[in-house]
Amino acid sequence: MAEDLAGLQQLDPSPVEDSPYETNKESYFPVDDTATTTPPVLKRSDTFGLNSHSAPWYLVRIQKYSSYAFSIFSAFHIANTSIIPLITQSVPASEPYLLLTRPYYQSPVAEPLLIGIPLFAHVAAGVALRVYRRRQQYEWYGAESRKEKRQIPWPKVSGSSKLGYLLIPLLAGHSFINRGLPLIKEGGSSSINLGYVSHAFAKYPAMSFVGFASLITVGVLHTTWGWAKWLGLTPELVTQGGEEGRLSRKKRWYLINAASAVIAGLWTAGGLGVVGRGGKAGGWVGREYDELYRSIPLIGKWM
């Protein structure tokens, strides 16, 4: 052991360099000159921060673009049932305009494309998006058993989404009374016009007012806030902090609700103020309307 130690050469200590030699001051380690570098590819994302190839990306766009189609129908519908009656101040004088535009959105092709398919796609995409985010939460928290999954809360529902879910039964009831019921009982809705609505207000004022007021209020609020979201104008999309950010969010909230109030007021003025005061229909037309209203499930026996 002593011979082995004696054979070792003792060296003076020397300082060790703090860092290796760098050929590129942008990199800590030497860079191979033969290697080609490519800039990183950034994945596209939308305003909601969703990957362009992920399921939420497609679901959000289905919701968005389906609302475009139904908005076209809504514009025609508001014009026929509110704006034109408000201008003419007469139900009979407004009927020709309704009959003139009806073939464009009640034809076998236009009705599914503008109303049925977009509505179904809009609602289905919203439900699917919530289910997808729910499953994401299972993965994030590592929930495997049923008990663990129950302990994880569902994703928060926005105010606009709550209005949308509330709008479903209101819109379904409105469509059934004005489109489905005449189709079932008479084979079509050619006899359904503004006078059909006026007749309901004249004979069943309380029920008609509650139904139409609820439909207008919920529908306008959901639509206005939805469009504000697509346009990036909702308060939660304000990224600025501090007092200015708070004031900006508050201002947007008031502006969106003010726009909703104007649209709802315009619709109410023409739809309820003119059409709702048109009076009941007489003769066989009035009896036909009464028979249709009495055929409404659940509430028809009180009409």
Model feature map: region roles:
Residues 1-303:
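Membrane-embedded alpha-helical bundles that constitute the cytochrome b-like, heme-associated redox core
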